[in-house]
C-alpha cells in the first residue's frame, strides 16, 4: 500500500517536487483526486446561522459544535459557500486553494489540471450540498468518516475557488476551463489552467 514510483520505464525523478529544480521549465501538473483528500475544516450552521467548527472525537467519531468560524476561513465561506439554512454543513476550501496554488507555481510555464469530485458556486448557493460531502472509505468500502488514521476521509472540492486562488497567485494566467468529465454526473469535474507562454 501507499505511493510507489516506477522510474524504470521513464526517465523521471522521484521525490518532493518542491526540491526538484524545474521552476523555470515548461511542465504539466496533474492532480487526479488529490485535492479531495486534503484536510478541510468542517462547519455547521447553528440556529442563528452562525457557522461553528465541528469537533470530532478521533476514536468514537462523536461530534460536537465548537467555536464560531473566524478569520480567512470565514471570509472564504461568505464568498464561496454562503449560508442557506440552520444545520447546513460546509467544508472550508482554504487548504485546497493553498495546495492548488503550490501546484500551479511548480513550473514557470505550463498547464495545471485538477480532476476531482467537485461542486459549483451555483449549486452550493441553491443549497444542493447542504448536507456536506464528507465521506470515509476503508478497503474500498464506504464507512463512517472517523479521523482515526485508518479511514480515508474525503470531501468534494470547490474547484471554482481553487481556480480563482490560482489566478490571484499568478498574473500570467492565460486560460481557465472547467468541464464535467462524465456527462452522466455533474460532481466529477476537470479544472484546466494554463500559465505563461510556451517558447
Residue spans of the language-model regions?
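Short, glycine/acidic-enriched loop or turn micro-motifs at the edges of active sites
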Residues: 14, 35, 117-119
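Conserved protein kinase catalytic core
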Residues: 17, 22, 38-39, 122
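Conserved acidic residues
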Residues: 26-27, 110
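Short, well-ordered coil/turn elements that cap or connect secondary structure elements
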Residues: 2-4, 24, 35, 107, ...
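SAM cofactor-binding core of SAM-dependent methyltransferases
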Residues: 1-25, 195
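A mobile, often basic/glycine-rich helix-loop segment
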Residues: 28-77, 128-136
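Short His-Asn-centered micro-motif
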Residues: 10, 31-32, 115
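Long, Lys/Arg- and hydrophobic-enriched amphipathic alpha-helices
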Residues: 73-199
Amino acid at each position: 500500500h501507499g505511493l510507489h514510483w516506477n522510474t524504470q520505464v521513464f526517465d523521471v525523478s522521484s521525490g518532493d517536487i518542491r526540491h526538484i529544480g524545474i521552476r523555470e521549465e515548461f511542465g504539466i501538473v496533474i492532480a487526479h483526486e488529490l485535492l479531495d483528500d486534503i484536510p478541510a475544516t468542517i462547519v455547521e450552521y447553528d440556529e442563528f446561522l452562525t457557522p461553528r467548527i465541528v469537533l470530532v472525537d478521533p476514536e468514537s467519531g462523536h461530534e460536537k459544535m465548537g467555536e464560531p468560524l473566524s478569520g480567512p476561513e470565514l471570509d472564504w465561506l461568505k464568498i464561496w459557500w454562503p449560508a442557506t439554512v440552520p444545520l447546513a454543513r460546509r467544508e472550508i476550501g482554504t487548504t485546497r486553494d493553498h495546495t492548488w496554488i503550490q501546484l500551479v507555481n511548480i513550473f514557470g510555464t505550463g498547464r495545471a489540471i485538477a480532476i476531482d469530485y467537485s461542486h459549483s458556486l451555483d449549486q452550493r448557493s441553491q443549497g444542493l450540498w447542504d448536507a456536506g460531502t464528507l465521506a470515509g472509505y476503508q478497503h474500498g468500502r464506504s464507512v463512517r468518516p472517523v479521523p482515526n488514521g485508518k479511514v480515508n476521509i474525503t470531501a468534494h472540492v470547490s474547484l471554482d475557488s481553487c481556480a480563482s486562488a490560482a489566478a490571484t497567485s499568478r498574473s500570467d494566467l492565460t486560460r481557465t476551463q472547467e468541464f464535467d468529465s462524465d456527462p452522466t454526473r455533474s460532481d466529477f469535474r476537470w479544472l484546466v489552467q494554463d500559465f505563461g507562454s510556451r517558447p
